[in-house]
Every structure is written in C-alpha cells, then in structure tokens.
C-alpha cells in the first residue's frame, strides 16, 4: 500500500522537530536492515535522509550522484552493504549520534 504525500510530509515534519522520533526512526531503519527487511529499512532511511541531511548534501559527502543514491534506496534498489553502512555512518555523524547493537534472546 502506497503512503499518501500528506502522510510522508507529516513524517518529515516530525523528524525535523522531534529529536527522539528522529533517532528512533534511524534505529528502526537499522533494525529493519539487520532483520532482513531491506525494503522497510530503505524506505525509512529515505524518509530520514529527506528530513535531515538531504540527498544533495549526502551525495557530496559520500561522493556519489544523488540520483544514484535515491535509486539505490528506492523500491527496486539493491544497495550493497558497504553503501548502506557508509550512508548510516554519515547520518549518525551528521546528527552527532553513536549507534550500538545489543544482542538478546528472542
């Protein structure tokens, strides 16, 4: 089911004004990737990028074309792990975050 433009705009607005929500969204994207839910991880990451650093600025830092990054994170994109981890590193550094992975039993 496709999300409406209004919903996406609401999410972006909240990411911009709510630090806890922004951090939780990045964590949710990373969790999705680690759980093998690649499409979900990419979708959340796109929203996060749109609301924070933006694809143009990200492309300058990562030294890749912004359209290439958008395609990589699009519904049909197939990003390599090194690209995903590079993007996550840039995002966490940009927001002055430290990411930890905690392993527990299910």
Model-derived features: where do they sit?
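N-terminal flexible/basic segments that precede or flank functional cores
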Residues: 1-44
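Amphipathic alpha-helical interface segments used for dimerization/assembly
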Residues: 30, 88-91
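Short alpha-helical DNA-recognition segment
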Residues: 50-71
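Short, basic-rich loop-to-helix N-cap that marks the start of a DNA-contacting helix
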Residues: 76-89
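Short C-terminal boundary/hinge segments that cap the last helix of small helical domains
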Residues: 93-106
């Amino acid at each position: 089911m496709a999300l409406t433009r209004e919903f996406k705009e609401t999410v972006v607005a909240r990411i911009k004004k709510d630090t806890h929500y922004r951090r939780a969204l990045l964590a949710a994207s990373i969790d999705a990737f680690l759980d093998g839910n690649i499409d979900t991880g990419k979708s959340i990451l796109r929203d996060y990028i749109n609301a924070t650093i933006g694809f143009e600025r990200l492309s300058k830092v990562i030294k890749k074309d912004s359209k290439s990054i958008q395609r990589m994170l699009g519904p049909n994109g197939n990003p390599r792990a090194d690209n995903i981890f590079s993007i996550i590193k840039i995002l966490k550094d940009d927001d002055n975050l430290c990411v930890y992975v905690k392993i527990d039993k299910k």
